[in-house]
Amino acid sequence: MTLMVRVITPDRTVWDAPSEEVILPATSGQLGILTGHAPLLTAIGNGVMRVKADGKWLAIAVMGGFAEVENNEVTVLVNRAERGEKVDKAAAQALLDEASKVLNTSSDKQERLQAKLDQQRARALIQAAEMGSKTGS
């Protein structure tokens, strides 16, 4: 038996396929989902979700949203998502560097808040890219 996993953003579907296992970056911590999991609704933070399909792990950077688990279906609705192998690592590193610079120099609360969010996003993208470049289980 498998899980049907969907990762959906406002403008596209990032993943829609049968999978064996999912690890979600819930706001309360990492959450593992296998077949037969109890129904669940949880908030998703900025981080990397991992999907095991055909015996291999896939990393997807996700940016805030919700996940629902019911009847061996996992639906992840997030603001943004990017598969690890499609991440532009140089652009993500540039975003991280710029956000760190703003945090070190700005005293404006709004700028600092946005920089913290950008840092989280960049770190998730970089982590997904690094995981996406690895093979195996």
Swiss-Prot record:
The keyword Membrane applies. It comes from the Bacteria. One of its GO terms (molecular function) is ATP binding. The keyword Membrane applies. CDD domains: F1-ATPase_delta (cd12152). Keywords: ATP synthesis, CF(1), Hydrogen ion transport, Ion transport, Membrane, Thylakoid, Transport. GO terms for cellular component: plasma membrane-derived thylakoid membrane; proton-transporting ATP synthase complex. Its main location: membrane. It is found in: Cellular thylakoid membrane. It is a peripheral membrane protein. InterPro entries: ATP_synth_F1_dsu/esu, ATP_synth_F1_dsu/esu_N, ATPsynth_dsu/esu_N. It holds the Pfam family ATP-synt_DE_N. Produces ATP from ADP in the presence of a proton gradient across the membrane. HAMAP family: ATP_synth_epsil_bac. F-type ATPases have 2 components, CF(1) - the catalytic core - and CF(0) - the membrane proton channel. CF(1) has five subunits: alpha(3), beta(3), gamma(1), delta(1), epsilon(1). CF(0) has three main subunits: a, b and c. Belongs to the ATPase epsilon chain family. NCBIfam families: ATP_synt_epsi, PRK13442.1. This is ATP synthase epsilon chain. It comes from Synechococcus sp. (strain JA-2-3B'a(2-13)). The lineage of its organism: Bacteria, Bacillati, Cyanobacteriota, Cyanophyceae, Synechococcales.
